[in-house]
C-alpha cells in the first residue's frame, strides 16, 4: 500500500509515524522535515498548495491513497483534484473544508440547521452598519476575518482589543482589506479541543485535548499556533462533565449530518474548538484537519491502523477507533522571538537518544534537514504515561536534551495550570 502525505509540520510527523507502520510513505511538502524524511520512501519538495505538482507526484509514485495534513491545500481543492484523478484522499473537498476556510459559512450552517453550541453572529460588508450593530449589541465582541489566518487573525475584546471601540476600528480595517468581516458575541469560559474521524455519516471520537495558544507561561503574550497541549488517561478533561462531553459530541455529529443535508458531505478529520461556557460547550471554530499540536496527543496512542481508518473513511465505511488509556503532554519548542520576530537559520542541537532514554518522543516541525530553524515552532517533545503528572514529567525531562536559541512553556500540562482552568469553570458555574 502506497500512501501520499502532504505537509511537513509536527502534526504531519505524527501522522507519518503511524502511516509508515502499515504503508509505504511518499511525501510532498514545502521543506524537508528530518523526522518525516527518515520514514519516507520518497520525498518531493513543492508548495503544498501547488495542487497540479502534488498531483504529478501522486501519479508518478502510483499512490493508493492520500492524506492531507494542513488546511491551505484543502482550501485549494486538493482533495477534489486528487479524487478526480483516481487517488482516494482522506480530507474534505474544497466545498466541505469551508467549515474551516470560511468562518461565515460555518456560522450560517449552524444557524440554518439549528446545531447546538452555536453563537450569535453577523457578517458585515458595510462599515457604518457594523459600527451601529456593535453599539446596539452593547456587550463585548469577537472580530474575525472570514478566511484562514493560521489562528492569529481573530481578536477578542478584553484580550487583544481593549474595548468595542477598538473592535470597530479593527473590523473596519478587515472590511477595507477583505470586503467582509464576521462579528460574534464573546463567549467566556475555558477552551478545549474535540477531534473526530468521520466518513460523512458516522462520527468516531478521539480523546479530548487542551491547547495552550499563548506564547508565554501563565497564558499571556501573543496567540501562536499552539505552544503545547495535554490529554488525560480517561480521554476526557478534568473540568469536563459527562454531560458537557455528550453535548460537544452531539454538536459535531449534528454538523456532519448538516453537511450531508447541505450537499457538501464532510469526510476526514473534523476538529471542534469549543469554549466550555456556563450553560453548554459553544463552538469557537472548526478545523478541517488534525490540530497541531493536538494530533500529537491522539495519534501516538491510537491502537488501530491509521491506514485502515483512512481506507474506511474514503470508502464511507468507518468502523471505529480505539485509543490506549494513557495521558499525553506535548511541549513545543519555538525559536526565540516567535511568533512576532523569530530567529531563523539557527541550528538546533537535539540529542534524540537521550530524549528516548527519558521515555519521551520527538516530532519535528519548522526545521530543515540540517536542523536549522525556519521561523515557526521547531519541534515538539511528547510524554506519554498512565497519569498526567508522569506524562508531564517525561516531556519536561525530554525537552532538556534540546539546545539552541529557543524557548518553550514549562507550564504546559502542569498540575498548577490545569488547577487554574478547573477553578475558572467552577467559578463560572457557581460551584
UniProtKB/Swiss-Prot annotation:
It is an enzyme of class 6 (ligase). SUPFAM superfamilies: Glutathione synthetase ATP-binding domain-like, PreATP-grasp domain, Rudiment single hybrid motif. It catalyses: 5-phospho-beta-D-ribosylamine + glycine + ATP = N(1)-(5-phospho-beta-D-ribosyl)glycinamide + ADP + phosphate + H(+). GO terms for molecular function: ATP binding; metal ion binding; phosphoribosylamine-glycine ligase activity. Pathway: Purine metabolism; IMP biosynthesis via de novo pathway; N(1)-(5-phospho-D-ribosyl)glycinamide from 5-phospho-alpha-D-ribose 1-diphosphate: step 2/2. Binds 2 magnesium or manganese ions per subunit. Its cofactor is Mg(2+); Mn(2+). SMART domains: GARS_A, GARS_C. ATP binds at residues 134-193. One of its GO terms (biological process) is 'de novo' IMP biosynthetic process. It comes from the Archaea. Its EC number is 6.3.4.13. Mn(2+) 2 binds at residues 285, 287. Residues 107-315 form the ATP-grasp domain. Keywords: ATP-binding, Ligase, Magnesium, Manganese, Metal-binding, Nucleotide-binding, Purine biosynthesis. Mg(2+) 2 binds at residues 285, 287. Mg(2+) 1 binds at residues 273, 285. Belongs to the GARS family. HAMAP family: GARS. This is Phosphoribosylamine--glycine ligase.
Amino acid at each position: 500500500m502506497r500512501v501520499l502525505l502532504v505537509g511537513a509540520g509536527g502534526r504531519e510527523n505524527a501522522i507519518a509515524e503511524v502511516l509508515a507502520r502499515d504503508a509505504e510513505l511518499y511525501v510532498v511538502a514545502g521543506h524537508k522535515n528530518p523526522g518525516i524524511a527518515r520514514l519516507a520512501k520518497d520525498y518531493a519538495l513543492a508548495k503544498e498548495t501547488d495542487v497540479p505538482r502534488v498531483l504529478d507526484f501522486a501519479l508518478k509514485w502510483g499512490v493508493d491513497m492520500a492524506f492531507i495534513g494542513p488546511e491551505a491545500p484543502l482550501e485549494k481543492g486538493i482533495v477534489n483534484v486528487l479524487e478526480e484523478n483516481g487517488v482516494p484522499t482522506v480530507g474534505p473537498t474544497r466545498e466541505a473544508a469551508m467549515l474551516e476556510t470560511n468562518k461565515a459559512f460555518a456560522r450560517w450552517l449552524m444557524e440554518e440547521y439549528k446545531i447546538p453550541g452555536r453563537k450569535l453572529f453577523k457578517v458585515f460588508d458595510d462599515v457604518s452598519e457594523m459600527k451601529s450593530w456593535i453599539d446596539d449589541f452593547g456587550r463585548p465582541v469577537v472580530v474575525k476575518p472570514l478566511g484562514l489566518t493560521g489562528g492569529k487573525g481573530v481578536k477578542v475584546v478584553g484580550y487583544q482589543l481593549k474595548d468595542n471601540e477598538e473592535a470597530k476600528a479593527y473590523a473596519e480595517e478587515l472590511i477595507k482589506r477583505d470586503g467582509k468581516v464576521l462579528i460574534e458575541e464573546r463567549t467566556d469560559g475555558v477552551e478545549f479541543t474535540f477531534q473526530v474521524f468521520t466518513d460523512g455519516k458516522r462520527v468516531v471520537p478521539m480523546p479530548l485535548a487542551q491547547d495552550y495558544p499563548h506564547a508565554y507561561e501563565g497564558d499571556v503574550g501573543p496567540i501562536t499556533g499552539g505552544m503545547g497541549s495535554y490529554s488525560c488517561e480517561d480521554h476526557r478533561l478534568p473540568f469536563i462533565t459527562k454531560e458537557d462531553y455528550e453535548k460537544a459530541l452531539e454538536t459535531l455529529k449534528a454538523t456532519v449530518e448538516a453537511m450531508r443535508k447541505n450537499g457538501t458531505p464532510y469526510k476526514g478529520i473534523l476538529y471542534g474548538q469549543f469554549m466550555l461556557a456556563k450553560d453548554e460547550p459553544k463552538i469557537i471554530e472548526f478545523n478541517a484537519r488534525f490540530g497541531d499540536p493536538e494530533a500529537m496527543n491522539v495519534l501516538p496512542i491510537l491502537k488501530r491502523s491509521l491506514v485502515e481508518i483512512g481506507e474506511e473513511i474514503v470508502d464511507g465505511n468507518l468502523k471505529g477507533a480505539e485509543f490506549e488509556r494513557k495521558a499525553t503532554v506535548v511541549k513545543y519548542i519555538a525559536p526565540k522571538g516567535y511568533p512576532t520576530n523569530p530567529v531563523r537559520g539557527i541550528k538546533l542541537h537535539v540529542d534524540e537518544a537521550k530524549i528516548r532514554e527519558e521515555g519521551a518522543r520527538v516530532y519535528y516541525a519548522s526545521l530543515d534537514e540540517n536542523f536549522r530553524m525556519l521561523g515557526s515552532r521547531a519541534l515538539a517533545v511528547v510524554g506519554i504515561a498512565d497519569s498526567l503528572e508522569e506524562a508531564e514529567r517525561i516531556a519536561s525531562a525530554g525537552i532538556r536534551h534540546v539546545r539552541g536559541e529557543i524557548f518553550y512553556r514549562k507550564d504546559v500540562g502542569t498540575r498548577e495550570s490545569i488547577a487554574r482552568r478547573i477553578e475558572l469553570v467552577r467559578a463560572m458555574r457557581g460551584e
